[in-house]
A protein has these predicted regions:
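Specific aromatic-rich, kink-prone transmembrane helix
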Residues: 99, 119, 138-155, 163-167, ...
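Transmembrane-lumen/periplasm boundary regions of multi-pass, lipid-linked membrane glycan transferases
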Residues: 181-277, 284, 288-293, 299
Length: 494
């Protein structure tokens, strides 16, 4: 009888692994295919990350450097087409699902691990994120690796502390939100102390050593990245806004899917009362959600800012759904998310190039279109009227033209009269210090004339348009300029 029970357990374990591998391989291949076929232009942030990848550094204005290193690696392998810039995204999400499986298996059992990994892999947020590249992608990968390493270190010690330190350090080099992991770790030690003090110090020392180059870079640049991160929170203009809070809560339901959200909420309410692993996992969920819920109430918060909560959240949600009194709960929740993921892929492929299907305000893809068209027109002007550098007025146009104005990377400088540094281009290039014999100005018509007057020679060439959707386009005036004479002395803008 005992051998029969073991055989049944092994059979269930093997079947579970087959389900997981099928989901991992099937969804990853599908996402890679959609990625390659996607008609979407690079989003402004993606184009900026690509530009960073051409200029290796230990830090950048708004983010730590790992995203740039990651893109440099993938584009070195497959080239710098849009899908090459985004290639790491579906692959790292698959890796994150693998670590979620390992963490769920270590805390509970293989069945829970498989269920949790499939929950993570099918989250609508992951389905959409797999078609883009962002700092959330490596953050989630290293967060999940750190979670698994911490579980193993608490259970077995030894070299797992080194793995924890490695994951923590690389996570901090991916996104500063990795610091929330330390709060979860502290929560776990207070609720269920098991850590070796020596092991914890080893992990922290490794993490600190890996992160140190970015700290040094920030010190050399006035801690500009930390300043930008704090400004993102916009606490200076804080005020109570219930509408922002409700919008953020709705966005979290959309991020994980309604079924998974209900499973997670049920688990958060009921399981910690009798489940030690659940109490421990809450440390990696609650602080993130509570912080951003509070921020949403007083200043607003982007939907993706709380995404790290859903690594541990996938495990807890899977556990809650599997233990639900209604047995099909897990399958229904995952099935709904699979349909949502397919809808996202279908929308990208079918509507990615259609700029007039939605009213402009309701178009979810409007910021991922039109840049290639603008870049092609600017490239033609550069060929007809040779110019060494492109001058623009804003970060979005600067990032997009660096990628889409050929040959890439186009030498782009942003108009920035003396004043606060607001972006990467303000930090890295001062128009007055850039030696360019000839410039191509790409600017809104109402600003271009005043800017052209600040050069000793200027020639109006024409206008170009960037499709915006809903039969609208943004117009840019094109000038050829020579010899910058300096910014206006009184007015901060032309």
């Amino acid at each position: 009888m005992h051998n029969g029970g073991e055989r049944n357990a092994n059979t269930r374990y093997t079947a579970g692994l087959r389900v997981l591998l099928s989901a991992l391989i099937g969804l990853t291949v599908l996402r890679l295919a959609v990625l390659i076929a996607s008609p979407l232009d690079l989003f402004v942030d993606e184009a900026q990350y690509w530009l960073w990848s051409t200029r290796p550094s230990f830090g950048y204005y708004s983010k730590p450097p790992f995203i740039a290193w990651l893109i440099a690696f993938t584009t070195a392998l497959v080239g710098d087409a849009e899908w090459g810039v985004r290639l790491a995204s579906p692959l790292l999400h698959a890796g994150t699902a693998g670590f979620v499986f390992l963490a769920g298996r270590s805390l509970y059992d293989a069945r829970t691990g498989v269920a949790a990994a499939v929950v993570y892999l099918t989250l609508p947020a992951v389905s959409f994120s797999s078609l883009l590249i962002s700092t959330d992608v490596p953050l989630l990968f290293f967060w999940s690796a750190a979670l698994f390493s911490l579980i193993q270190a608490r259970q077995h010690g030894g070299g797992w502390w080194g793995g924890l330190g490695l994951s923590l350090g690389l996570g901090l080099l991916s996104k500063y939100a990795m610091a929330f992991f330390l709060i979860g770790w502290l929560w776990g030690e207070l609720s269920s102390p098991r850590a070796s003090r020596r092991g914890a110090l080893v992990a922290l020392a490794i993490a600190g050593s890996l992160y140190a180059p970015n700290l040094v870079w920030n010190a050399a640049h006035g801690f500009i990245s930390y300043q930008h991160t704090s400004e993102n929170a916009d606490l200076a203009g804080a005020h109570m806004n219930a509408g922002e809070l409700l919008a953020f809560m709705a966005s979290q339901i959309a991020m994980v899917g309604p079924g998974v959200f209900l499973g997670l909420m049920a688990a958060l309410i009921s399981r910690p009362l009798r489940d030690e692993p659940a109490r421990w996992l809450i440390g990696f969920i609650a602080p993130v959600l509570v912080f951003y819920l509070a921020l949403a109430l007083v200043a607003g918060a982007n939907a993706n800012w709380a995404v790290s909560a859903y690594v541990a959240g996938s495990i807890l949600a899977a556990r809650g759904l599997m233990r639900a009194s209604w047995r099909p709960a897990w399958g229904m929740a995952v099935g709904l998310n699979v349909l949502l993921g397919l809808a996202i892929a279908g929308a990208v492929l079918c509507w990615g190039e259609e700029t007039d299907r939605f009213p402009l305000r309701a178009d979810p893809l409007k910021r991922l279109r039109g840049w290639e068209t603008l870049g092609a027109e600017v490239s033609q002007w550069r060929q007809r009227y040779p110019a060494d550098c492109v001058l623009v007025t804003d970060r979005a146009t600067a990032s997009a033209m660096a990628y889409y104005a050929l040959p890439r990377p186009a030498p782009v400088v942003k108009w920035h009269p003396p004043g606060p540094i607001r972006d990467h281009f303000d930090l890295t290039a001062d128009l007055a210090d850039v030696a360019c014999p000839a410039w191509l100005l790409v600017a809104p018509p109402d600003r271009a004339t005043g800017m052209a007057r600040r050069f000793t020679g200027s020639e109006a060439l024409g206008t170009v348009g960037q499709p915006q959707g809903d039969r609208r386009e943004r117009r840019y005036a094109i000038y050829r300029l020579h010899e910058f004479a300096g910014y206006p002395t009184r007015s901060p803008s032309p």
